[in-house]
Amino acid sequence: MTATGRRLRADAERSVQAILEAAERVLKEDPAATLEQIAEAAGVARTTVHRRFANRDALLAALAESAWRQIAGAVEGARPATAPPLVALHQATANILAIKSGWTFALGQPATNEEIGRLQQAVYAACDEVFRRAQQAGDIRAGVDLAWARQVYLALINETAHGPTGGGEPDAAAARILDVLFHGIG
């Protein structure tokens, strides 16, 4: 899609995707990399990058938005409102871990536009819904502060994805996260 909401041609969509993927790789290695370096890594002309993104800030916003769109889709795919809470939580966790490792730089960027903020809020709201449902089902004690539980859960995901041991296989890592979240380490 363009900034005006028009759909891009298939070849233009591929170029944008190649630029975003290259930007993630290049910027993860060198956050000060230029648009020219990103164009080279994407295998496109510098003018193609400038035609698709008005400036570096626009590219960074598109990068973060693309990553958050994938996270939101992964969470939605776990059926947080209808699947049994622990099943939805496990699936969402595995889905997020599979995405997070590929978008380290993008997901570390602040929300710079309304769409990124909306996507983040949708992800957090789905998480809160699953936690509420898990508490109603008795999987989380009645007195637990669910906002705090979400913070702990997100910290576990982040540490798993970016910590020194790496995430490993997403399904096994999700099981490990939920085991620590629900049973502690004691």
Regions found by a protein language model. Name each.
Residues 1-3, 91, 121, 125, ...:
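C-terminal peripheral helix-coil segments that are non-catalytic and often amphipathic
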Residues 1-29, 33-41, 58:
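Basic, helix-initiating cap at the start of DNA-binding domains
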Residues 12, 64, 68, 116-124:
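Amphipathic, non-transmembrane alpha-helical scaffold segments
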Residues 18, 37, 58, 87-91, ...:
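Amphipathic alpha-helical interaction segments
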Residues 43-53:
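Short hydrophobic/aromatic patch on the recognition helix
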Residues 53, 60-67:
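Alpha-helical DNA-contacting segments of helix-turn-helix folds
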Residues 62, 73-101, 112-115:
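Hydrophobic alpha-helical connector segments
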Residues 87, 115-119, 136-152, 168-173:
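All-alpha amphipathic helical-bundle segments outside canonical DNA-binding/catalytic cores
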